[in-house]
Amino acid sequence: MQYLLSKKRIRKNFGKINLVSSIPNLIEVQKNSYNKEFLQLGVPVDCRENKGLQGVLNSIFPIHDLDGSAILEFVRYDFDEPKYDVEECIQRGLSYTAALKITLSLIVLDDSDKSDPKEIKGIKEQAVYFGDIPLMTANGTFVINGTERVVVSQMHRSPGVFFDHDDGKTHSTGKLIYSARVIPYRGSWLDFEFDAKDLLYFRIDRKRKLYVTTLLMALGMSSHDILNFYYESATYKKYKKSENGWIVDFLPELVSTKHLAYDLIDAQTGKVLLNAGQKITFRIAKMLADKGVKQILVKNDSLVGKLLAEDLVNNQTGEVLLGVGEEITNDILTIVNDLQITTVKVLAVGGQCGPYVRNTLFLDKNKDQKSSLVEIFRVLKPGEMATTAASRGLLDSLLFDNNRYDLSEVGRIKINSRLNLDIDLKNTCITVEDIKKIIKLLVDIKDGKALVDDIDHLGNRRVRSVGELVENQFRTGLVRIAKFIVERIGSVEIDAVVPNDLVNAKLLTSVIKEFFGTSQLSQFMDQTNALSQITHIRRLSALGPGGLNRDRAALEVRDVHPTHYGRICPIETPEGQNIGLINSLAIFAKINRYGFIESPYRRVINRRVTDEVVYLSALEEGRYKIAQADTSLCTNDCLIDGLVSCRYDGNFVMVLAQEVDFIDLTPMQVVSVAASMIPFLENDDANRALMGANMQRQAVPLLKSQAPLVGTGIESVVAHDSGTVVAALHDGIVEQVDSTRIVVKTSVKKDAGAPGVDIYNLKKFQRSNYNTCINQKVLVNVGDIVKKGDVIADGVATNKGEIALGRNVLVAFIAWNGYTFEDSILVSERIVKEDIYTSIHIEELELVARDTRLGPEEITRDIPNVNDESLRHLDEVGIVNIGAKVRTGDILVGKVTPKSESPVTPEEKLLRAIFGEKASEVKDSSLYVPPGITGTVIDVRVFSRRGIDKDERTLAIEKQKIRKLVKDYEDELAVIQHFTIVRVKELLVGQVAACSLDSIIIGDKLDEAMLNKLTNEQLLKLKADNSSIMDEISEIKCHYETTRAQLTSQLNSKIEKIQCGDDLPQGALRVVKVFIAIKHRLQPGDKMAGRHGNKGVVSKVVPEEDMPFLEDGTVVDIVLNPLGLPARMNVGQILETHLGWAGVNLGRKIGKMVDDYYSGNNQCTDEIRKFVKKIYANNSIADTIDQVNDQQLIEICQELRQGIYFSTPVFDGAKIADIKQMLELADVDKSGQVRLIDGRTGEYFDRRCTVGYQYLLKLHHLVDEKIHARSIGPYSLVTQQPLGGKSHFGGQRFGEMECWALEAYGAAYTLQELLTTKSDSVEGRIKMYQAIIRGNNNFVSGVPESLNVMIKELRSLCLNIQLEENDEEDENEDENY
């Protein structure tokens, strides 16, 4: 139990549904895609599959030159070790990469050999450097130029065939225009579409449309083939008993709704089925066919208008009377009767079989393959010479060439599935059979026999993860390299070159750098807190290259779709124009090898719910009946109800229990990580839940983190998977602990049985991407036993291994003097005084000393025209000291820059002669603390170019780093040495000495006391007469020496890396980075929020004595507006408040019992045990309570007295009755309301108020970072007006309405000053400055620039306005008149 308390927090779980499968690692989406699927790291070369990087290289190589004299083949690829680790890359501003070495084999062929294949003259194999490839960190991110970035997964339309219609928008009558589109993974798009006249067309790459029959004939089909493929035939046979009658097959699908013109007679029985004038429909015809009607009798004239299925030939002369597909007319019918033709085959057209293909065929001017190919060529390449061979080659290259057209396995699966084909998955080109079947299905859809696709169905959308995105970039780069190699082979003497001479790696690295640096999907990682990191990694974007455009994305794409269930979160998405386009993966969802999102379900076999978990994609799910997770089950996991509500094919249906195929794993699987952290989510309005999920990601990590009293149970999972906490890599025992590192002796045995040593260096006060503070705190003590995966150190915004974004504070829902108006938040002074919502932010400031054309810039303390007060924080080198408290305007790093010579006056010459020349030659270009920053310098990093002399500060920093490395080296060696000595002693005890050493003589029997007197060196030299023991000792000594040599080598290489200097950008000599920690206390203007979308701004910090307080004297921490609840419908916050209130009061009750125990009442332990078991009833912890002794129980209760922590999972959490039960156990009112006393008057409020503990967050919208004040500052070069915005240190806009306000009060001089001197009167500014210097209070405004602009505009309208200046006397004379 102590182990449990020290590593994990005990939570009372209200969940009813047992989880049979754990939550999959939350960042495996990224890691699997890049490391396993793309790079195949850790896979032996011989075992690599043909995918990812291996697949791309196999598809590009071998490369043949144009004349067949050489072949360049791919053999294998390998990666070098990264030059720097992740931390070093972040510190130095480098990318975390590894060199890609590809082994290529150049096969030189004999040109003179005319045989095929040619004789090989020689083979040259070489490993060629192909550039540096970014590696993924353990947290699923990339380090590019020193900053962590995330490559977001992209949702896009899956390759395959899609059938759609235009919703009647194209045609004025609202007629549906059907179309089909074949989308390959790579290559040309192929479209098929109907027009308003029901003719069928095709397009390639959205070029001009052509008749679809042109394509079919170009693919080798004749008119006869086309008609026979797309239409069934019906045979009319002459009825022998009547000259005017025919027998024909009865086909219901050819029947159209109409009134019969003649009797419908069964040909076999002669029975009249329907009389003339009766109505016939497809349904009636189907019923007749089902009853056994096979053939019917029709009159002679029924053949008129039918279309021939084969040529109508005069049997006597062989003459073709009517061609295939042509219409039978009365004249033709007369000829048929005259020639006594007894059998006529016609196309089965009519009713539900439209003549679209036939009509298109007869309007198509192209009648053979040659003309069809030429027609297609002219459309695709207008203006070029069209030949049959060129036309055939173009069509083949566009649609049937593997190098240019690729459906991918996904596309082939989709096409096979949609068209019911069985083509091999390796055939990733479109086939003629595909095209024929697509047209046939499109015609069927037009005829109403099939349905169009739902493009928003997740079976039609897939995810391109980071590995696939980078693979596509690799393909682009390697195609460029392949072209370069072909050109290069043709321009060199092939016998004299090696593969390295043929490759230009920059063509690949430039593409990769561009993608990681500037792509819309490669994003600056959101590092505000652990949740924001994990959410960013799990984000799905429909935007980006090959995706949607946010300006044109329709509502349907953004909307929630039934197939999102368990795959994409319906709640978490941004507010604003990206809503619905950027989504988050559901918490249990996985992405399969084809890029489709899968959700987990438990299999149900004959009503019994098994523990087998099956992941289903959206397409697979539609075929099964899936019950809800909260469906009633009996004790042996069988369905109780006879009828069960299930999801089937996108709808909710009631099915028999024995027909159920699957059941949801957990109700939580619907939502994302952030949404699943909102307790009582089911009681919140979806819009507010969206805000709550989004605002948790904006929570600033606090100085003192606290896990939520009311959680959902996944807080520890999020903290662990985000990588912000430190988890033990192996089982072991903690050897050493300090604030910066943990040393663990692992139980994993290495060679000779020696233990391993894990050293965990903690991150201390590092800056994140968003300037928040990354700091890790130790949780373990020396001697603690740790298991693999245990949290041994808390990270940013975590507490005891659980994510902790805010604080549990006592809130009251009351109105308080209007200070809670419009969601404002009233805060007690205690919150500020005790640093409850204080956060540390770290600013990074950088100074670069460059080599200029006038000479090098110098970092120095000797700065011209700067007094000693300004230099007080600098050391002798000119760099600020760590620990200095700095404010705006202070110098952080002194730097002087050489300036060009200007003409020197005699006075300056004299001054130079007296004071020396240095001051005149340089100007101050130091690094100053920018406006709005006041804090403490916590770190300084100095980087110097290789080869230049290092200053004292640089050397001191290097010594500190080396000292830390040596300490790690000594500690790791000490653990191994200790094991070695102990093990050697164990082996030698009881043995006979075989050599004399110190006080030991040959033949002495060795005991522990004798061995303890020897030094470590002597002990390792001692020999015994037992050879097997000596062999084992030799093995241990050998392992020790080998390990020491390895550690020494590693230490030396690390020290060399530190001392060798840095790779700096061109022209930079030194770079100094200064990190300033800024403490932000809570103050009016800061934004705060709960987890339910309840947000507000701090309006006032009120003294504790004025705040409302409880009857026991407890002062309320925060006052919230009760009116913020009804309209927002986020009732979850009230339930959370009540449950938090119960938790704290239960803790207080346990605390009183513990105090009673310590005061001497030792008999109360049974009562405590009984009470604690009552709280944790129906939880596994209740059984543990029975197993601990009294002392351990009291230790547990000491932890619990701070408050009982609850877990209320999403959709399966605490009900009202559960909350009331907890309130009752805590001996507080079941209503959750108390009587509050007004701190100002000491009187009770009129009625009872809702008071309780709510988890509130401080968001990353701090007033200190929003508001600034300008006195003087920069002006725009064009308008000469002050700039705007904090980043430009701009002013506040004084607009038209503000001018009206001053005009209304007659403040003429104030208005004049604002519109001239303080705005754009350059002359007025200078005069004011001069007047202030002279101590004169009379200011002259001058003419503003905006007036000159207006005059120029009026002149453009031919109105010449001139400003005239009159003397004062003239003005007086004018007044006298």
Swiss-Prot record:
GO terms for molecular function: DNA binding; DNA-directed RNA polymerase activity; ribonucleoside binding. It comes from the Bacteria. Keywords: DNA-directed RNA polymerase, Nucleotidyltransferase, Transcription, Transferase. GO terms for biological process: DNA-templated transcription. It catalyses: RNA(n) + a ribonucleoside 5'-triphosphate = RNA(n+1) + diphosphate. SUPFAM superfamilies: beta and beta-prime subunits of DNA dependent RNA-polymerase. InterPro entries: DNA-dir_RNA_pol_bsu_ext_1_sf, DNA-dir_RNA_pol_bsu_external_1, DNA-dir_RNA_pol_su2, DNA-dir_RNAP_su2_dom, DNA-dir_RNAP_su2_hyb_sf, RNA_pol_bsu_bac, RNA_pol_bsu_CS, RNA_pol_bsu_protrusion. Transmembrane segments: none annotated. GO terms for cellular component: DNA-directed RNA polymerase complex. It holds the Pfam family RNA_pol_Rpb2_7. Its EC number is 2.7.7.6. The keyword Secreted does not apply. Belongs to the RNA polymerase beta chain family. PANTHER family: DNA-DIRECTED RNA POLYMERASE I SUBUNIT 2. HAMAP family: RNApol_bact_RpoB. DNA-dependent RNA polymerase catalyzes the transcription of DNA into RNA using the four ribonucleoside triphosphates as substrates. This is DNA-directed RNA polymerase subunit beta. It comes from Orientia tsutsugamushi (strain Boryong). The gene is rpoB.
